[in-house]
Amino acid sequence: MALWMRLLPLLALLALWGPDPAAAFVNQHLCGSHLVEALYLVCGERGFFYTPKTRREAEDLQASALSLSSSTSTWPEGLDATARAPPALVVTANIGQAGGSSSRQFRQRALGTSDSPVLFIHCPGAAGTAQGLEYRGRRVTTELVWEEVDSSPQPQGSESLPAQPPAQPAPQPEPQQAREPSPEVSCCGLWPRRPQRSQN
């Protein structure tokens, strides 16, 4: 009982102490286009990740996106509206020092419909020969296949053997079928589990 009474003032201070305004702003806008507008896309050594912006930077981007979307569109008239990029797809990468000025920031903006943005997350492979790409929660893997060319000289002369066709490499299965989905993707429910087929 005495321990609880000692911790009561500390709990009261924690309850009164508000969260960081940038974190609170990001927590309020965790769905749809606001998610992209309130975050920086940063390239790290293990792939791309998002960090929250301050409230002022996010509001400036929203105001500029609204003024740009009200101007005339540069898209061709024949292009379908669903094929356009969403207006709120604002990808911001901080390529300067941490805490640098806004002149060191590279901003790329695409205008279009108000659909929710499609986010690509790039995770390079461990050996550098495979690249992982996540598209709406589905993992796409592309691998580099090296083919060895037989450059040994053919024996010439009276003992020449009949010409043999060069050895063809065995066809490799598709990387999608050969790999199991990674456990960190399947545990979140993003990757649909395939039923195991019974071999009879």
Curated annotation (Swiss-Prot):
> Which intervals carry biased composition (Pro residues)?
163-174
Chain positions covered by the region annotation Disordered: 148-200
Q: Which residue stretches does the UniProt record annotate as biased composition, category Low complexity?
A: 175-184
Gene Ontology CC = extracellular space
* InterPro entries in the record: Insulin (IPR004825), Insulin-like (IPR016179), Insulin-like_sf (IPR036438)
Which GO molecular-function terms appear in the entry? hormone activity
Tissue-level expression? Expressed in pancreas, eye and, to a lower extent, in limb.
The protein in question is named Insulin, isoform 2
Kindly list the organism's lineage. Answer: Eukaryota, Metazoa, Chordata, Craniata, Vertebrata
The UniProt gene name for this protein comes to INS-IGF2
